[in-house]
């Protein structure tokens, strides 16, 4: 079984939106969150989706899922105080309601990251099967530096040895559950 957990429990403070959290900002008549969900909805290898959402926005999300015919979202759980807690809330819901096997895969994805495609989801699933995990990463193109205790540039980091970790991040679900319980 391949399960997508989409976390969207944050308020988007840095975005400074006065009207709604950034995951519910609209683009072409749909929320950013729905654009993200659709990638997993339409992927043939994703069995179901769990969304961790701001508690006061769950009703809005349910209406949007219904309006656009989204069928793979099995549960919407309240988001937590942190991303980790939002993911853990979703994991607990899955564990309470599903008979999990050792080969069940979970893809963890940020609800405000809709710029993914079917191939990336497939590569994450295949990576878990081959290596035990799959973490999306891209090259570091910008110059990165370290700073000293005064905030002054100290050293330029060789970008050839740096990658930027992104989402989805994918694992065997039992391993993620165990790690979250220890955290």
Report residues per predicted region.
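Short coil/turn connectors at secondary-structure junctions
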Residues: 1-2, 102-103, 130-132
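N-terminal glycine-rich phosphate-binding loop and ensuing alpha1 helix
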Residues: 2-59
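Residue-level signal for inorganic ion chemistry
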Residues: 6, 33, 90, 110, ...
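Short glycine-rich anion-binding loops that position phosphate/pyrophosphate groups of nucleotides
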Residues: 10-13, 56, 82, 111-114, ...
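Conserved N-terminal catalytic core of the sugar/cofactor nucleotidyltransferase
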Residues: 34-103
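Short aromatic/hydrophobic "clamp" motif used to bind/position activated sugar donors
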Residues: 106
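Conserved core of the sugar-phosphate nucleotidyltransferase
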Residues: 115-183
